[in-house]
């Protein structure tokens, strides 16, 4: 009987600790940020079951143009959640990753996902398509307004390193 009680108390304490940990993650972000994370989670959760699984990741990568992602890479991503990745776990993982992260490096990392060759540029037309079809869909006018301020290389690709500098430091470069 005593051992059953201790086991029950241990479960209750673990549940309380998990609730406390998950409630803290929501206080790390503003409501608008949480909504953006929710939209990102919904984009990744392809089968809409509330849990990100390997097939969700494969489909998301496929939509981003990366068809053959190594199984080990997908497994490593899923293992970061130490269990099923629901929205709270997803938010916690981002909270851990972004805590103390340089905003410029975070933006560069996001762009690198669209630059598998590591050239420092992303294809303008592919990026335009993503902006108009994923998450907070941009209108054609909004995309053109964005691209008017976006540095391009001679081939018409987006120079995302320069764009990142503009986003984090403003339009004027230091002399």
UniProtKB/Swiss-Prot annotation:
Tissues expressing the protein: Predominantly expressed in adult atrial muscle.
Modified-residue entries (Phosphoserine), positions: 22-23
N-acetylalanine PTM positions: 2
EF-hand domain boundaries: 32-67, 102-137, 138-173
Keywords annotated in UniProt: Acetylation, Calcium, Metal-binding, Motor protein, Muscle protein, Myosin, Phosphoprotein, Repeat
Annotated GO CC locations: A band; dendritic spine; myosin complex
Record-listed Ca(2+) binding positions: 45, 47, 49, 56
Top-level taxon in the UniProt lineage: Eukaryota
UniProt-recorded Gene Ontology molecular function terms: calcium ion binding
SMART domains for the chain: EFh
PANTHER family assigned: MYOSIN REGULATORY LIGHT CHAIN 2 (PTHR23049)
Quaternary data: Myosin is a hexamer of 2 heavy chains and 4 light chains.
Misc. comment: This chain binds calcium.
Protein name: Myosin regulatory light chain 2, atrial isoform
Native species: Mus musculus (Mouse)
């Amino acid at each position: 009987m005593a051992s059953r009680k201790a086991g029950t108390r241990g479960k209750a304490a673990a549940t309380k600790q998990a609730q406390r940990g998950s409630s803290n993650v929501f206080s790390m972000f503003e409501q608008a940020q949480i909504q953006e994370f929710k939209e990102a989670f919904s984009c990744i959760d392809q089968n809409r079951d509330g849990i990100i699984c390997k097939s969700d990741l494969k489909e998301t990568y496929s939509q981003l143009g990366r068809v053959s992602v190594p199984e080990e890479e997908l497994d490593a991503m899923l293992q970061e959640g130490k269990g099923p990745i629901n929205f709270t776990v997803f938010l916690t993982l981002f909270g851990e990753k972004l805590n103390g992260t340089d905003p410029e490096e975070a933006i560069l990392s996001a762009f690198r996902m669209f630059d598998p060759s590591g050239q420092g540029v992303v294809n303008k037309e592919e990026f335009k398509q993503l902006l108009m079809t994923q998450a907070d869909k941009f209108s054609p006018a909004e995309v053109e307004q964005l691209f008017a301020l976006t540095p391009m290389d001679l081939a018409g690709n987006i120079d995302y390193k320069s764009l990142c500098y503009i986003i984090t430091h403003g339009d004027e470069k230091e002399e």
